[in-house]
C-alpha cells in the first residue's frame, strides 16, 4: 500500500505544479516542472521506484522491473492523483478562462510524433539510470529524469503541450488545458513510447533481463540501494 501512496503523492505534486504553472503562464514552467519531478523522484525512489507516470510504469513492466499487479495499482494511483491535483490547481488559481489546446488535422500527427519521441526519451532514460545493474547506488538519477522532462517541455511544449505523461494529460483535461477529444493522442503516445523504451532496453542490455536479476529488482529499482524506475 505504501508504494501506491508514494506514487499518488509524487504524481499529485507533479500535476498540481504543471497545472498552476501553465494556467498562470509562467515563463519558467519547464523549470518548475522539471524541478518538482526531480525532488519527488529523490523523495520516493526508495519506496515505489517513483514512476509518477503510466508510460514509465509500462516501460518498467515491459522491462520486467515491476509485476503486472503492481503496475495496475500504480496506474490507478497516478490517475487518481492527476484528477485530484487538477481540482486543487483549479481551486488555487481560480481561472476565469483557460486556453484549451485542441488538436486537429495535421497537428494531430505532429503532436503524436512529438509526444511519442519524448515519452520514449523519458522512459528510456529512466530505465537506464534507475533500473540498470550497471548503475547501482547512483546519485544522479533524479537530475537525469527531471532534466529530460525539462528539455522536452522546452522543445515541444508549444507543439503538443509537452505532456509525456497520461496522468498529466488527464489532469490537464480536467483543468481545461487539453480538449477531451485530444486525450487519445497522449494515451497512444504513452503506449508507443513506453513499450518501445522497455523493448529497446532489453535489446541493448541482454545480460540485464528479469530472470538474471535478484528478487529485489521486482520493485522497479536497482538491486542494492533503491533508485526509481521513475517520471
Task: Describe the predicted segments one by one.
Residues 1-231:
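Membrane-interface helix-loop junctions and terminal tails of multi-pass membrane proteins
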Amino acid at each position: 500500500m505504501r508504494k501506491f501512496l508514494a506514487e499518488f503523492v509524487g504524481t499529485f505534486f507533479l500535476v498540481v505544479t504543471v497545472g498552476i504553472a501553465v494556467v498562470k503562464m509562467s515563463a519558467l514552467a519547464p523549470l518548475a516542472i522539471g524541478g518538482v519531478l526531480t525532488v519527488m523522484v529523490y523523495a520516493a525512489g526508495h519506496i515505489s521506484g517513483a514512476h509518477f507516470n503510466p508510460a514509465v510504469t509500462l516501460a518498467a513492466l515491459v522491462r520486467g522491473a515491476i509485476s503486472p499487479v503492481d503496475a495496475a495499482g500504480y496506474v490507478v494511483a497516478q490517475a487518481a492523483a492527476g484528477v485530484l491535483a487538477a481540482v486543487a490547481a483549479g481551486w488555487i488559481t481560480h481561472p476565469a478562462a483557460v486556453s484549451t489546446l485542441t488538436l486537429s488535422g495535421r497537428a494531430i500527427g505532429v503532436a503524436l510524433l512529438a509526444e511519442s519521441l519524448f515519452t520514449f526519451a523519458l522512459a528510456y532514460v529512466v530505465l537506464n539510470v534507475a533500473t540498470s545493474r550497471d548503475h547501482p547506488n547512483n546519485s544522479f538519477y533524479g537530475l537525469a529524469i527531471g532534466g529530460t522532462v525539462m528539455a522536452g517541455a522546452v522543445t515541444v511544449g508549444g507543439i503538443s503541450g509537452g505532456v509525456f505523461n497520461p496522468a498529466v494529460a488527464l489532469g490537464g483535461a480536467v483543468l481545461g488545458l487539453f480538449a477531451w477529444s485530444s486525450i487519445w493522442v497522449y494515451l497512444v503516445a504513452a503506449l508507443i513510447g513506453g513499450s518501445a523504451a522497455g523493448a529497446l532496453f532489453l535489446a541493448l542490455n541482454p545480460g540485464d533481463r528479469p530472470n538474471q536479476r535478484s528478487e529485489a529488482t521486482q520493485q522497479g529499482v536497482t538491486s542494492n540501494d533503491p533508485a526509481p524506475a521513475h517520471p
